[in-house]
Design a protein with these regions (language model features):
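Long, charge-rich C-terminal accessory regions
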Residues: 92-95, 99-261
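Generic non-transmembrane alpha-helical segments
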Residues: 16-24, 55, 59, 95, ...
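Helix-enriched interaction subdomains in cytosolic or periplasmic regions
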Residues: 24-55
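C-terminal, charge/polar-rich interaction regions
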Residues: 245-303
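Short glycine-/aliphatic-rich beta-strand segments at the starts of folded cytosolic domains
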Residues: 1-9
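Conserved short beta-strand edge segments in small beta-sheet-based binding/regulatory domains
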Residues: 5, 27-33, 54-77
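Short amphipathic alpha-helix segments
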Residues: 8-29, 52
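Short, low-order "capping/linker" segments at domain edges
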Residues: 72-95
């Protein structure tokens, strides 16, 4: 079992932390250098967490638990127009990233308006490529309830946010509802906003833990972080990809930000513990920019 952590410190002697992660059999999920600061999201064997903490103290850094690291979350807004963005949804996105999440903003083509909103099948397919979807809706209870058709048949856990208090049973298809996050024409910096964001983090972590527990009953044939590491080491084109996190971990697979038509053969032939990746995963064309989506097969699939 692995524990996901975030290391925050200076870039001086950062290589010592990277080398320790590798020596312990861990994996770097994501690494960011911001001026003189280094932030590393990592997965470490549970028994070795104390060693990472000791090294962090030695380097005058900080270690925090990052339960969302290694997941990809969709934050869905009814539209990209200022009517719904940028404020609440963007602050939700930024806040989740503090806890290790990799999130993507998705604006529906015609999701605005209580009586005119809609969602296409293509948009649903894109949302379902993620681990969890957060639908950032508005401030009116009746409008939020009537827009439940946007997500009632989406095949991943769905969290809905809005301003009023609503019982989740009134929202068909939603796994959870978090209030206090409607349309707010400013940054979410006030006390009640921060409390609502913290509640959203707790709710998201709870749903991800439930999904992990469910997957544990029939786990993937290989951990997604192991597959991520294998692809990064065996597909040379990854080093030439300038997108953020060119191989993005998910609970049940990875998103490889390389063109499927050009590179899918290289990805299919990646060796993972002596087996071709194509033998232990479904490798398909993503609905996001034509990237390559790898979804790992469960152990029961080979019985």
């Amino acid at each position: 079992m692995y524990e996901t952590l975030t290391y925050s410190g200076g870039i001086h002697k950062g290589n010592e932390m990277r080398e320790l992660i590798e020596d312990l059999g861990g994996f770097i999920i994501q690494e960011n250098i911001i001026q003189m600061d280094l932030v590393i999201n990592m997965a470490i064997p549970v028994d070795d967490v104390d060693k990472i903490k000791e090294k962090s103290d030695e380097l005058l850094g900080k270690i925090t638990f990052a339960p969302m690291a290694g997941t990809e979350i969709a934050i869905v807004s009814p539209t990209l127009a200022r009517h719904h963005l940028p404020h609440a949804a963007c602050d939700i996105s930024e806040y989740l990233r503090r806890y290790g999440a990799k999130d993507n903003m998705i604006g529906l083509a015609r999701g605005h308006g209580k009586g005119t909103s809609g969602i296409s099948q293509e948009e649903k397919y894109l949302i379902e490529e993620h681990d969890v979807a957060i639908f950032a809706l508005g401030s009116f209870k009746d409008c939020i309830i009537k827009k439940s058709f946007l997500y009632d048949d989406i095949d991943i856990p769905v969290i809905v946010t809005g301003a009023p208090e609503i019982d989740v049973d009134e929202l068909p298809g939603a796994d959870a509802y978090v209030s206090g996050l409607g349309r707010i024409p400013r940054r979410l910096k006030r006390g009640e906003n921060i409390r609502a964001l913290k509640k959203l983090v707790e709710t998201t972590e709870s749903i991800l833990n439930k999904k992990r527990k469910y997957m544990g009953e029939d786990p993937p044939l290989a951990p997604s972080i192991l597959v991520k590491d294998a692809i990064e080491n065996q597909v040379p084109a990854i080093k030439e990809a300038y997108t953020p996190t060119p191989v993005t971990s998910q609970l049940d697979g990875v998103r490889v930000k390389l063109d499927y038509d050009t590179y899918h053969k290289d990805i299919e032939n990646v060796d993972v513990n002596g087996r071709k990746l194509s033998d232990i995963a479904d490798i398909t064309k993503s609905h996001m920019y034509g990237y390559t989506l790898v979804k790992l097969l469960n152990e029961s699939s080979i019985v």
